[in-house]
Amino acid sequence: MCIRDSILIVAVLLQIIFFIPSFLLKTEKYYDLVGSLTYVTTVSLAYFAVENKTMIDSIIYFYVMVWASRLGIYLFRRVRNDGKDVRFEKAKRHFFWFLQYWMGQALWVSLTACAAIIAILSPEEDTLPVLAMVGMALWLSGFAIESISDYQKRVFRKENNPSESFIHTGLWARSRHPNYFGEITLWTGIAVIALNTLTGIEYVTLISPIFVYILLTRMSGVNLLERIADERYGHLEEYQRYKRNTPVLVPKLSKDKI
């Protein structure tokens, strides 16, 4: 069995291992943390399987570790403080419904990290081409946007009741979902860094940022949060004005006063 197959199996096994106690306890508190753990584990398996590591290998590995660790801790703290995650309110009581989320997480990790994993496992010269530098700039920009957005939202939720008021300050005055824009941007950066190392069929892994975009804007993320926000704040004129004047995803350069 090759290392690539082993990594996919590990991603699935981790979900099963943590799904069982989570279902028995009817809790979703560890879901996002396990997602981050799966990123860390699978990318680490790829990285430490390579004998002659290059600069690009180490950069990609470092970027994924930093992103997964920060996001996992942030999401775990959020669900712990909130006491629940609205995504799983009904699903966690039904075995197969809840299991679908966990298996979906294995797919999410595998497709999102595929470019990073294949790039690490692919042999390439230990150089840092201009294309990789462009990718690094994209990753750093995306990571900064996502981190700042999450921090601003965490501070807002501490000072306000999210069931009564919505965040529309900071980066959230420029985009209704700046954190998702940041995540899409940073995974695009990883794909650009990986581009120089891929050959043949490996170019298929460039689906990574496309999958992240589709997942966050079409399958979950934006659609779910927009629906929840409409239900909570749809009666507020300032919310309707915010929706009219603020892009869903790509931040605008200027911000309007709400």
Predicted features and spans:
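C-terminal ends of transmembrane helices
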Residues: I16-T27, I73-R80
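Select subsegments of transmembrane alpha-helices in polytopic membrane proteins
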Residues: Y31-L33, F96-V109, R176-E183
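A basic- and aromatic-enriched beta-loop-alpha substructure that forms the phosphate/nucleotide-
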Residues: I56-K92
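Transmembrane helix irregularities
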Residues: L24-L25, S69, M103, S175
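Hydrophobic transmembrane alpha-helices
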Residues: D5-Q15, T38-S69, V109-Q152, K158-I258
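Juxtamembrane helix-capping/reentrant segments at transmembrane boundaries
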Residues: L25-T41, G83-Y101, S165-W172
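Short, small-residue-biased leader/transition segments that mark boundaries at the very start
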Residues: M1-I3
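Short, hydrophobic transmembrane alpha-helix segments
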Residues: F19-K29, A46-K53
